[in-house]
A protein has these predicted regions:
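Conserved nucleotide-sugar donor-binding catalytic segment
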Residues: 5-107
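Phosphate/oxyanion-binding loops and surfaces in catalytic or ligand/nucleic-acid-binding neighborhoods
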Residues: 77, 81, 114-117, 185
Length: 194
């Protein structure tokens, strides 16, 4: 950063001319990869108006995840392509919406709704195995439980760990957290590395 207390955007601009190819892992019919955890940065997207209109834009009634919902819907009507390198900086801070705790896992609800609506296949017949989808849900449940265990409600954490355990995700850790959730007072301690 330049001298001083802030950095004007012009000082952070880098030459992106070397990013002329698409990243094959992040390009194509991405629906199943999005279901399985691929993230798309909203701040770097260029979306055709026809795609935006076809999916009806953002669902602003959602409390969280409206951008992920947007990408899932978009991936059903058009291929998506990503450049082969970083093109933006993204700051994540503790007060952002992605860190707000909720009793329910909005991501689990979103993933289940997408799979019920569209199944586990792209329009080009790439599929996500049902077991892989269940593992994805289990990871999301585990993460939801872990966050609630350390910064939220132990009862919610316990229920989320039970869901993860039923799918066989990190069984020993799930059992330990389930047991500890009965005794650990809220707000004490710091989270260890997951």
């Amino acid at each position: 950063l330049p001298e001083g207390g802030f950095a004007p955007a012009a000082s952070l601009v880098e030459d992106a001319s070397q990013f002329t190819r698409m990243d094959p892992e992040r390009s194509g019919w991405l629906y199943t990869r999005l279901l399985n955890g691929l993230l798309v940065g909203m701040n770097t997207a260029v979306v055709r108006r026809s795609v935006y209109d076809a999916i009806g834009g953002f669902n602003e009634a959602m409390r969280q995840g409206e951008d992920y919902d947007f990408w899932l819907k978009a991936s059903r009507v058009a291929e998506m392509h990503s450049l082969n390198g970083p093109v933006a900086l993204y700051r994540i801070h503790g007060a952002s919406a992605m860190h707000r705790l909720s009793p329910e896992s909005h991501l689990v609800n979103l993933l289940k709704a997408a799979s019920m609506r569209w199944g586990l296949k792209t329009l080009s017949d790439q599929s996500l195995a049902p077991r892989a989808f269940q593992e994805r849900l289990a990871r999301v449940y585990f993460d939801h439980g872990y966050t609630h265990y350390w910064r939220g409600d132990r009862t919610i954490a316990r229920a989320a760990f039970w869901h993860a355990l039923r799918s066989g995700h990190r069984p020993l850790r799930c059992i330990v957290y389930i047991c500890l959730s009965y005794w650990r007072p809220n707000g004490s301690g710091r989270p260890p590395a997951a």
